[in-house]
């Protein structure tokens, strides 16, 4: 390894990334940098399975649980913060280990990103309020009137992309698609990325997904989301996509029993994990894939990663 090397430990939710990354950081003088879009937020460490205090007491962690849920966050903002932290870590002659499953962040960090102009806070607030008032379908119809191309590429149920495309057009007068076709900008072109993709066998992955959600529900996620619901208006947490939030809110509103909410969250987590695996397989080409089908094989992964990543 050199001071220009970065390890990215990626994979689906509940694949064991956090444990493996923590153990690597302890063994090889590393520091952990978050590359998960939901773990950046304050007040939801349980539902997002953020690193526990026992981990942060042993290893230095960056970009976890620092952002208010009312604040807007974008891939460009993430990249700037991540680049700063990576340079700080390497300046201390330590190994940056990025852990997460947000494909857009990983892809943009490694292969470059589309620099879309920032949206003013006033306009952002206006669009959020409009969405709260009229909902996805009507907002999609408004987007189609302004930007037919973008609307044709966005599912009406994809709230985040829908709002993003609408506000970009209002801010710039241009389709978000016009920015996405420009040459990509590289933020860390002089660094070497070593991407380790954890790919558990599907049956084992689904088992760990179910166990993860069961543990989260039992260890405080319901109280965590109840507090969010009490302290903030729904429009303030529209961008919180962590699996389990929607189901817990339904339980708190009396629309689901607790058992049904847990079951629904487990199903959605398995579906999300499956999509993540497909995305990483298809979108990240230059990577090392590590497969395992049970706990015993997973335990051996820690012995394999150093050689695959070139850690000495």
Swiss-Prot record:
Residues where substrate binds: 13-18
Keyword line: ATP-binding, Magnesium, Nucleotide-binding, Transferase, tRNA processing
Molecular function terms from GO: ATP binding; tRNA dimethylallyltransferase activity
Annotated signal sequence range: none
A biological process term (GO) from this entry: tRNA modification
Keyword Transferase in annotation: yes
UniProt cofactor(s): Mg(2+)
Residues reported to bind ATP: 11-18
Catalytic reaction annotation: adenosine(37) in tRNA + dimethylallyl diphosphate = N(6)-dimethylallyladenosine(37) in tRNA + diphosphate
Pfam families in the record: IPPT
Region Interaction with substrate tRNA, annotated ranges: 36-39, 160-164
Enzyme Commission number(s) from the entry: 2.5.1.75
Site (Interaction with substrate tRNA): 102, 124
Family: Belongs to the IPP transferase family.
UniProt-listed NCBIfam families: miaA (TIGR00174)
Subunit structure: Monomer.
Protein name stated in the entry: tRNA dimethylallyltransferase
Native source organism of the sequence: Rickettsia akari (strain Hartford)
């Amino acid at each position: 390894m050199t001071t220009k090397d970065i390890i990215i430990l990626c994979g689906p939710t509940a694949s064991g990334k956090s444990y493996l990354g923590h153990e690597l950081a302890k063994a090889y003088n590393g520091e952990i940098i978050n590359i998960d879009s939901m773990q950046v937020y304050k007040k939801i460490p349980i539902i997002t399975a953020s690193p526990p205090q026992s981990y942060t007491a042993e290893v230095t962690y960056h970009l976890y649980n620092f952002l208010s849920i009312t604040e807007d966050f974008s891939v460009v903002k993430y990249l700037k913060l991540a680049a700063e932290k990576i340079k700080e870590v390497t300046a201390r002659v330590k190994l940056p280990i990025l852990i997460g499953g947000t494909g857009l962040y990983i892809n943009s960090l490694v292969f470059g990103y589309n620099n879309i102009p920032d949206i003013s806070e006033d306009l952002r607030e206006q669009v959020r309020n409009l969405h709260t008032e009229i909902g996805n379908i009507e907002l999609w119809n408004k987007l189609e009137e302004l930007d037919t191309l973008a609307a044709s590429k966005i599912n009406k149920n994809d709230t985040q992309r829908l709002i993003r495309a609408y506000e970009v057009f209002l801010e710039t007068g241009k389709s978000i698609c016009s920015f996405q076709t420009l040459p990509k900008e590289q933020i860390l072109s002089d660094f070497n990325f070593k991407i380790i993709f954890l790919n558990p066998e599907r049956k084992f992955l689904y088992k760990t997904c179910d166990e993860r959600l069961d543990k989260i529900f039992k260890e405080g996620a319901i109280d965590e989301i109840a507090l969010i619901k009490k302290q903030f208006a729904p429009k303030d947490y529209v961008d919180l996509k962590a699996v389990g939030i929607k189901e817990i809110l339904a339980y708190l509103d009396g629309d689901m029993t607790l058992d049904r909410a847990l079951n629904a969250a487990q199903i959605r987590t398995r579906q999300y994990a499956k999509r993540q695996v497909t995305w990483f397989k298809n979108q990240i080409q230059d990577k090392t894939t590590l497969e395992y089908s049970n706990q015993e094989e997973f335990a051996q992964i820690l012995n394999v990663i150093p050689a695959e990543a070139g850690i000495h």
